């Protein structure tokens, strides 16, 4: 006969604890990196509009036979031609770093600051181009008065204001989209 095994009673096995990891909350996405790329596009738009404005105003202020030379000199021989473009880029990058994903109103208010910064950058470049340090105080006062109401300074400020508003609208829309994505990830 074959040996029969004695059935062993089943012992209750201890239940091992199950450890669940909490899901990590979604990272707060920033608008800063992409914002700089959007500002770069805005700067190209500013440079194009600024160039057109310089061409139009220079064509009104100079005789027609001197226009090509004056236009070339406006962007290659003087600081006042290209400093507003750099000032716009720097001002908008600083604005993007500060307001990040804010709404459009923050970019509208910040655009005022950018426009004033571009205006004063042009005035400063204009004074440097005119060698203000070689002037007498009376000549400097006349030079400064002409710099404040220079049509190019006003144009630089106005164009910077408009481009900063529309670039800000683009940045705010992207920031709103990032906020919406974060809300969906939290749910």
Language-model regions, residue ranges each:
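Low-complexity segments enriched in small/polar residues
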Residues: 19-187
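Acidic/Ser-Thr/Pro-Gly-rich, low-complexity N-terminal segments
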Residues: 1-23
